[in-house]
């Protein structure tokens, strides 16, 4: 790449800048080191730096060249440092008759030494001395560094002679790596050349296995810190898996082992093909473009591609929306595909190291696995062998001879519990074009694939290798469409393909009994559906396969399942079940989290959808796997409790155990049961208490909770307290219950929810009851924060105290909320289309108002307050948060207990709620269902 291609003269004109500084020095009255002169020189250099960076950014926006931009910024820094060092040694601290010790070379090391920089990159410098430091040398180093620091640069530096460099490189792998990237800048070039020769002879030679082992271990540790998967939706572009540092590691290893200076030399050595070199350069260029744009956009060394900057970076790179995918999602898919390419390059280079050269280097094989080189056949035709506990190909042409071997490789690896030899994976990657329609329809290939997918061992591991190699997306093109696809929201932590693989991992863990404490019901049910277990694995692989399309992904996915299942070898009946599961895979989560499970209509409607116990069992396990695989912290005990409740209540309907007694009869039974539990109360007091709650309370609240509430209200009355709260942690459900007894008034729930928000409580559910003597008994469930019940109870009691203070007027709610109403920075990056639905068919007694919008602190308080202002009574509220999006359902009646049936009134309610949610013009709605899970 020539200077002409880089257009370096547009970044900075070195001679013009040098001439300008010389003229300043020649005409100035003060010495070059005087404060006034220093200020003038510093400002001149700052101006050149700012101008060069601005020009580099403009050129990046025009030509899009990431590598070009990195080289331009590096050239800018080289020029400024060269001129600065020249002036330090000739103007500030000149030597007329320098001794041998009064000499040095200025060397770029680390990332700067590699010849590429982003705007905020560190500038790593080595001041290389021939002997010990001298007073002259100290002055030059100090002058250079202070000028660079005053220019606002982050400079890492060391001052060493050659002996010190060699000694430290021998002891410290980080220093060794930095010197591997060393690049001469200015000063004594012979001194630098001496360091290069000694580094090669005394450090590199004979230490290849040691260095490569250290770099691979360092890479693995870095991945663990940044996130094991390359498909985290907020990746670290520099340090994350599949990022820049992985490319650097590959080049360090090859440079150290093959003694090359450029990537192009790897093609001549046969390490990379021309196509793979092109892939390397494209990946490097894209990652540089992303990183340079990030630094320019944020004006800092931002390395994490977080949600709040993804839109701007996507726009800078020129991405546009396509049907089913917005411009950010298209950009991020490209990013993750590049990260995958980096993984492919890692396997290719490791294979070349091991097979072409490593066997001749003593100790090298220890890097990759064991000392043994013993091979054994794995198949009758001898196509596959086991070598060092890894599966390998016996001949380079086995995939071309029989493309089914591309699937058989993974099948044998699963059956024998083997890792994959890098040579086999390299050959596989280079043979992907062999996967065509004939192979996809091949019965043997599909039989092998289904056995891999439903393996009783560790199907996720093998499927992950199939995905990383590109085989899975080629064998199932619909799956290939969602590889590396991200969803631009805060709820989903992984790309779609990564989520599907993690779903399969969760199911395998449940089947092996590894999650029975966390998921007792799923753990039990999996043992009762042995005949249908295969259907669950197939469903989990396919349930999100239609993401990124304009239509509902559940419906489109069901069509894909109907087409693929027969190909996999499923019967028509099994295909029908998988198709139904894919179509309904969000239903159970949505009903459990956003509907009133104490409302009989909810259960009956859900049972009508499910129809059979077999489907109910499969859907429950599917839902658990789906939610749990969304990301860390998404699953919690409260969601588990809701799903179990829905399962057990639906089971009663499907098995004929659901009571058809009239509402009045069930009310009578419940009052009699409570009376029996309060038999030690005086009859007059007991009868008076039983007259307090209305029918809905007795039909909704469990008997144990009714007893607890009775004692709670009795104690409050005896103490003469009109306002009181009670806290009860529920460890397994991961929620804490706060019960509030207070005089009833229309905005009571709004005040309670606002006080909860002000106290930091995250409400997940609320039930509202009134008594015949004008009091309210409200039960609020908040997310658990502490592991121990004692800590959680104390925290909940603090929340309760805030509620009491607000309700009693001791605290001013608006002031408290104002301190917490700043939305999270990441959430500001998203737009959630506000939606309001008013439904009179979901409940026999209540109108259900469902709202969807961008979450913000205090939103629930605002919503409940507005609903009260609209003269509506809230019977229950169900709060579900999906990252930045909230879906709240309110079961309401008018003030005389009737549903809201008047169309004009419904329209007014919608308009007011949409305005509160922030809808444009306050009037947009749509009829789609909320996406309740991944």
Swiss-Prot record:
Regulation affecting activity: Uridylyltransferase (UTase) activity is inhibited by glutamine, while glutamine activates uridylyl-removing (UR) activity.
CDD domains to which the protein is assigned, alphabetical: ACT_ACR-UUR-like_2 (cd04899), ACT_UUR-like_1 (cd04900), HDc (cd00077), NT_GlnE_GlnD_like (cd05401)
Domain comment as written in the entry: Has four distinct domains: an N-terminal nucleotidyltransferase (NT) domain responsible for UTase activity, a central HD domain that encodes UR activity, and two C-terminal ACT domains that seem to have a role in glutamine sensing.
NCBIfam families associated with the record: PRK05092.1 (NF003467), UTase_glnD (TIGR01693)
Catalytic activity: [protein-PII]-L-tyrosine + UTP = [protein-PII]-uridylyl-L-tyrosine + diphosphate; [protein-PII]-uridylyl-L-tyrosine + H2O = [protein-PII]-L-tyrosine + UMP + H(+)
Cofactor: Mg(2+)
UniProt keywords, alphabetically: Hydrolase, Magnesium, Multifunctional enzyme, Nucleotidyltransferase, Repeat, Transferase
Signal peptide: none
BP terms from Gene Ontology: regulation of nitrogen utilization
GO molecular function: [protein-PII] uridylyltransferase activity; phosphoric diester hydrolase activity
Chain intervals for the UniProt region annotation (Uridylyl-removing): 380-736
The EC number(s) this enzyme carries: 2.7.7.59, 3.1.4.-
The protein's name: Bifunctional uridylyltransferase/uridylyl-removing enzyme
Organism name: Brucella melitensis biotype 2 (strain ATCC 23457)
All copies of domain ACT, residue ranges: 737-818, 848-931
Family the entry assigns: Belongs to the GlnD family.
Gene3D superfamilies in the record: 3.30.70.260, Beta Polymerase, domain 2, cca-adding enzyme, domain 2
InterPro entries: ACT-like_dom_sf, ACT_dom, HD/PDEase_dom, HD_domain, NT_sf, PII_UdlTrfase/GS_AdlTrfase, UTase/UR
């Amino acid at each position: 790449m020539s200077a002409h291609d880089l257009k370096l003269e547009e970044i900075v004109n070195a001679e013009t800048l040098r001439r300008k500084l010389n003229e300043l020095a020649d005409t100035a009255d003060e010495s070059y080191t005087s404060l006034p002169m220093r200020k003038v020189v510093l400002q001149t250099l700052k101006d050149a730096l700012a101008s060069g960076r601005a020009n580099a950014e403009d050129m990046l926006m025009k030509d899009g060249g990431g590598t070009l931009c990195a080289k331009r910024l590096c050239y800018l820094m080289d020029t400024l440092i060269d001129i600065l060092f020249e002036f330090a040694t000739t103007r500030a601290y000149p030597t007329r008759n320098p001794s041998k010790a009064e000499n040095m070379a200025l060397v770029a090391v680390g990332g700067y030494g590699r010849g590429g920089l982003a705007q905020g990159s560190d500038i790593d410098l080595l001041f290389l001395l021939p002997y010990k430091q001298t007073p002259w040398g100290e002055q030059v180093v100090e002058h250079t560094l202070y000028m660079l620091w005053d220019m606002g640069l982050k400079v890492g530096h060391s001052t060493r002679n050659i002996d010190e460099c060699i000694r430290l490189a021998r002891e410290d792998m980080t220093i060794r790596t930095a010197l591997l990237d060393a690049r001469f800048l200015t000063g004594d070039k012979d001194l630098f050349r001496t360091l290069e020769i000694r580094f090669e002879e005394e450090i590199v030679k004979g230490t290849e296995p040691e260095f490569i082992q250290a770099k691979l271990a360092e890479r693995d540790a870095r991945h663990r810190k940044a996130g094991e998967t390359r498909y985290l939706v907020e990746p670290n572009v520099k340090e994350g898996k599949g990022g820049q540092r992985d490319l650097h590691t590959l080049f360090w290893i090859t440079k150290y082992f093959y003694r090359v200076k450029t990537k192009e030399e790897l093609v001549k050595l046969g390490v990379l093909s021309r196509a793979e070199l092109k892939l390397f350069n494209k990946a490097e260029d894209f990652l540089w473009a992303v990183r340079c744009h990030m630094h320019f956009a944020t004006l800092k060394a931002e390395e994490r591609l977080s949600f709040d900057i993804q839109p701007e970076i996507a726009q800078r790179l020129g991405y546009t929306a396509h049907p089913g995918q917005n411009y950010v999602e298209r950009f991020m898919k490209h990013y993750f595909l590049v990260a995958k390419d980096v993984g492919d390059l890692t396997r290719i280079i490791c294979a070349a190291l091991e097979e072409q050269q490593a066997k001749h280097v003593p100790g090298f094989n220890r890097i990759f696995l064991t000392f043994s080189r013993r091979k054994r056949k794995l198949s009758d035709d001898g196509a596959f062998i086991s070598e060092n506990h890894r599966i390998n190909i016996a001949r380079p042409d086995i995939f071309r001879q029989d493309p089914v071997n591309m699937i058989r490789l993974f099948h044998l690896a699963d059956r024998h519990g083997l890792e994959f030899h890098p040579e086999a994976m390299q050959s596989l990657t280079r043979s992907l074009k062999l996967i065509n329609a004939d192979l996809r329809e091949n019965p043997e290939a599909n039989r092998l694939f289904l056995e891999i997918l439903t393996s009783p061992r560790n199907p996720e591991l093998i499927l992950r290798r199939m995905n990383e190699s590109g085989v899975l997306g080629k064998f199932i093109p619909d799956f290939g469409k969602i590889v590396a696809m991200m969803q631009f929201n805060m709820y989903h932590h992984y790309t779609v393909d990564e989520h599907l693989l993690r779903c399969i991992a969760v199911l395998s863990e449940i089947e092996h009994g590894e999650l029975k404490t966390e998921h007792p019901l799923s753990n039990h049910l999996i043992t009762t559906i042995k005949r249908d277990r295969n259907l669950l694995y197939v469903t989990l692989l396919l349930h999100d396969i239609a993401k990124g399309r304009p239509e509902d992904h559940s419906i489109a996915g069901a069509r894909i399942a109907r087409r693929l299942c027969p190909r996999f070898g499923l019967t028509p009946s099994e295909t029908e079940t998988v198709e139904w599961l894919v179509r309904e895979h969000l239903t159970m989560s949505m009903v459990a989290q956003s509907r009133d499970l104490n409302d009989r209509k909810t259960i009956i409607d859900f049972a009508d959808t499910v129809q059979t116990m077999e489907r109910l069992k499969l859907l429950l396990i599917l839902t658990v796997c789906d939610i749990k695989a969304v990301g860390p912290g998404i699953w919690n005990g409260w969601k588990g409790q809701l799903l179990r409740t829905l399962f057990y209540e639906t089971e009663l309907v499907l098995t004929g155990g659901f009571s058809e007694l009239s509402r009045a009869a069930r009310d009578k039974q419940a009052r009699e049961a409570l009376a029996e539990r309060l038999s030690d109360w005086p009859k007059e007091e007991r009868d008076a208490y039983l007259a307090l709650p209305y029918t809905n309370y007795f039909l909704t609240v469990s008997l144990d909770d009714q007893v607890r509430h009775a004692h709670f209200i009795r104690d409050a009355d005896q103490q003469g307290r009109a306002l009181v709260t009670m806290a009860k942690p529920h460890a397994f459900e991961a929620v804490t219950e706060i019960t509030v007894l207070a005089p009833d008034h229309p905005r009571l729930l709004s005040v309670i929810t606002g006080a909860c928000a002000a106290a930091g409580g995250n409400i997940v559910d609320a039930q509202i009851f009134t008594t015949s003597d004008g009091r309210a008994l409200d039960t609020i469930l908040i997310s658990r924060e502490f592991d121990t019940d004692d800590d959680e109870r104390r925290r909940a009691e603090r929340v309760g105290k805030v509620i009491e203070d607000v309700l009693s007027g001791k605290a001013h709610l608006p002031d408290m909320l104002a301190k917490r109403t700043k939305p999270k920075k990441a959430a500001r990056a998203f737009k959630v289309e506000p939606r309001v639905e008013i439904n009179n068919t979901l409940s026999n007694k209540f109108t259900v108002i469902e709202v969807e919008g961008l979450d913000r602190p205090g939103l629930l308080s605002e919503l409940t307050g507005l609903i009260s202002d609209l003269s509506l009574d809230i019977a229950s509220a169900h709060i579900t948060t999906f990252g930045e999006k909230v879906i709240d359902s309110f079961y309401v009646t008018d003030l005389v207990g009737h549903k809201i049936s008047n169309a004009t009134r419904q329209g007014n309610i919608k308009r007011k709620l949409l305005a509160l949610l922030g809808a444009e013009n306050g009037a947009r709605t749509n009829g789609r269902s909320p996406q309740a899970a991944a």
